[in-house]
Amino acid sequence: METGVPAHRILAVTFTNKAAGEMRERVRALTPAGRGFPIVSTFHSLCVRILREFGKKVGISERFSIWDRDDQTRAMKRVLKGVGMEDENPRLFLAAISREKGAGVRLAVYSEKAQNFRQRDVAKAWELYGQELARASALDFDDLLLKVHELLQNVEIRTLLQNRWTHLTIDEYQDTNAVQYEIARNLTGEHRNICVVGDLDQCIYTWRQAKLENLLSFERSFPGTRVVRLEENYRSTGTIIAAANGIIEKNQNRIPKLLRATREVGEPLYLFEARDETDEAWFVAESIQRLLAGKSSAKEIAVLYRDNFQSRVLEEALLALGIPYRVIGTRFFERKEVKDVLSYVRAALNSNVSVGAQASSEERRGLGNVQDISRIIATPPRGIGQTTLAKLLAGKEADLPSATRAKISAFRELLLRMQQALETIPLSEALRFILESSGLERMYKEKKDREEAEHFENVRELVNLSVRYDSEMPPIGAQMLLEEAALQSDQDEIDDQENRVSLMTVHASKGLEFENVFVTGLEQGLFPSRRLDENTDPEEERRLFYVAVTRAKNRLFLTFARARLRFGSREAAIPSEFLSDIDERLTSWAAVGAEAESVIE
């Protein structure tokens, strides 16, 4: 902008809504008033924006919906049941499909190359899953990228977008996959004004098809590139940075760099050897209790682990000591009560979308897609069950009793009134109408238990959140809310004002920082994980540990157990090989009891 580039010609892309929000705030602080504002977006939000505008060119309705993980899982369950594979894990099939889509592989190509029974099963499930998406006029996350990649093969649209955004910048470039690379390359075009920020040492998503090669080969892909090495670290103490350097330098497949701390040396890294996972959890909880008794704030403390199952025993210890905490990964928009309301919104907006290939257009009129209808038709109960819905979807409504047909007609009328509200009044008012007319509000108020009261508070919070879209022309605000819900990541759940200890996987911690960090479960087979197969990069586990270590600003605690309960049996444990990568002069064995209090002081 200082060189005269108009703000609206600049496109900045990152991976999470939280990161995009922080980027917007920083750009806003740097931008003089009246100079305009660049587009700052996540990859998936950018793709939604492009598909809303040009999607018809690739057969996408401008009113398409986006399926989240729960929507995808339920659809895959139906698919597998339909082909006699109901005992199979739908998430494994979805992961296999996502892996291929992320690599840019199309169904036709995959089907042609399928060599064994498993691959042929995946190909069949993929085909039927695609049909489910099409019937619902929906896209999953991978489709958002693939459809934009397909769209950019259109010379007219590609040229238009290249002229719209003449300067492209991408953060966390090491996390891009093959399709995202192609999108970036196509948007850059002849002007070649592209700036990327990336760190190979933090590439921890190759299992999601992130490609190290995108960053390693950047200078070959874009000749004339100028490389700026960012090696000064302003976050962590000198001791933490020295440990991080010692850990990551063991990896071979990286661009060499040596971080330099700008801060003081600081405290040593504290090691603790526990008897078992319970002893480890109590050490963590009691250490946090001492930190809180000192000058530390709960929101500046994080407990990290390799796998989600490790959180249970940690939660029990924190609860026992009355320490407030939150588990990152339980997303607001994935809570059942919130998804119920969103399903009403989506069903009302898409009330003319087909939900049964065998049903006539007259019989389908007034209903949304089967995912949402099956979720809301009995929430709250209205005398229409899943058996009735199955007959309706099969085009057998005429076979139903007249009383049941009357209930279906009333339900259609209800959706129509909701659709009218969403298309005419501000979104928050439309949501209040949906809560009242659907009976959801009455259902929650009639249930007196504490859990239901909390559910209703979550629904009310959804209404509060929707106010931000009230200024949008209906029904655009509703579509934007649905997009926000579908594209949310774990990190977007984090409220910086909430004063609680954070529990999360190391993957979820990427991009975050805390004054005090506990990295738990540092044992062979757990961290590094034993879940390594022939396609897994063994260096990625070390990169993951490097990410964990560099989340800490002031204090870092590294814990491991001599034995751990795994799959119902007590197993002896061996300390993680990563611990031996740290110079022992940087570490100190953590004290317990009264001695520990003097250490914290």
Role assignments for model-derived ranges:
Residues 46-54, 201-206, 235-236, 326-350, ...:
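Short alpha-helix plus adjacent loop in nuclease-associated cores
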Residues 5-9, 35-37, 71, 190-193, ...:
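Short glycine-/polar-rich loops that comprise or flank the Walker A/P-loop
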Residues 34-39, 256, 322-334:
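Conserved RecA-like helicase motor-core motifs
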Residues 223-226, 231-325, 347-362, 366-367:
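Helicase P-loop NTPase motor core
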Residues 4, 11-15, 19-20, 39, ...:
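Conserved helicase NTPase motor core
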Residues 1-62, 66-67, 136, 159, ...:
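P-loop NTPase Walker
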Residues 35-37, 56-143, 165, 229, ...:
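ATP-hydrolysis module of ASCE/P-loop NTPase motor domains
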Residues 115, 297, 311-323, 335-336, ...:
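Conserved helicase C-terminal RecA-like lobe
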